[in-house]
From Swiss-Prot, chain A:
Cofactors (names): Cu cation
Protein name listed in UniProt: Cytochrome c oxidase subunit 2
Disulphide-bridged cysteine pairs: none
Catalytic activity: 4 Fe(II)-[cytochrome c] + O2 + 8 H(+)(in) = 4 Fe(III)-[cytochrome c] + 2 H2O + 4 H(+)(out)
Alphabetized UniProt keyword annotations: Copper, Electron transport, Magnesium, Membrane, Metal-binding, Mitochondrion, Mitochondrion inner membrane, Respiratory chain, Translocase, Transmembrane, Transmembrane helix, Transport
Signal sequence interval, chain numbering: none
Matches recorded under NCBIfam families: CoxB
Family: Belongs to the cytochrome c oxidase subunit 2 family.
Protein's UniProt keywords contain Transmembrane: yes
Purpose: Component of the cytochrome c oxidase, the last enzyme in the mitochondrial electron transport chain which drives oxidative phosphorylation. The respiratory chain contains 3 multisubunit complexes succinate dehydrogenase (complex II, CII), ubiquinol-cytochrome c oxidoreductase (cytochrome b-c1 complex, complex III, CIII) and cytochrome c oxidase (complex IV, CIV), that cooperate to transfer electrons derived from NADH and succinate to molecular oxygen, creating an electrochemical gradient over the inner membrane that drives transmembrane transport and the ATP synthase.
Amino acid sequence: MAHAAQVGLQDATSPIMEELIIFHDHALMIIFLICFLVLYALFLTLTTKLTNTSISDAQEMETVWTILPAIILVLIALPSLRILYMTDEVNDPSFTIKSIGHQWYWTYEYTDYGGLIFNSYMLPPLFLEPGDLRLLDVDNRVVLPVEAPVRMMITSQDVLHSWAVPTLGLKTDAIPGRLNQTTFTATRPGVYYGQCSEICGANHSFMPIVLELIPLKIFEMGPVFTL
Amino acid sequence: GIGPIHPLQPEERQIGSVKLLGFLDVENTPCARHSILYGSLGSAVAGFGHFLFTSRIRRSCDVGVGGFILVTLGCWFHCRYNYAKQRIQERIAREEIKKKILYEGTHLDPERKHNGSSSN
């Protein structure tokens, strides 16, 4: 989960998120260099004694400041497209879970496991125990195995919602009447948090998502059924 | 930064981090510190060298800034390429170790197949 006043990305829990962090570092370095150049140009503009305002016919400069941004955009676009197509790769998921957004909770269906269905409500502050996270913890977590490709089918029963888990690099809109699909493979066990990411009414901020990722051996023993 | 495990707590990580222009975290971004340092060195060498030859201050500053950008970019791509290669090698090594642990002693053990074919 994010710590207080965190600005940067959370640590990665899936290979796609690792790639996204690498791309983010790459884009940020290019942005830093562009900002540095612009700040220097601004400094020169503010400290020059030259005041000629009718400069014209600077073909070389115009060529440079057209070609250079095009090259920069290509340098950014190529890795971006690579990751975009990587997220759409079909990787033969081990099983499928359906996530349905409601106002203001999530319903999860484990149809591969005998039709287990449960709701996941945020824990109200009065029901929090010491160590629980305010506005993040839920009554029933989504329990999943580590290192197994999982397919999430996401939809909504009423208005638009969005199922997001930042550490996995996931954000998929829950649209009524439409079934969106996303797949992921978690690389390490733990409890990971996300929040609804599409404005959906008064309690939009109070319908979090909690994934509990456990080793496959323990998952197969069936703890997810003990509700 | 990248990687699931960091030895420092988030608060400690924040105290140690230096953010250039307020957003580029050079401590926690792989290759950033290395690139910026070499870029600064390149900028100083290029700018000062140009000044020694031409005695033009303004143009030397421009050469210094240009040198910083080019050297930083060059070091950055070189370092990131090697970093990506290293990550791929680590992943291959991890997979091979996992396979070895799983298949050692079984009929699927690649070493047993190799030894069997060489003895024949």
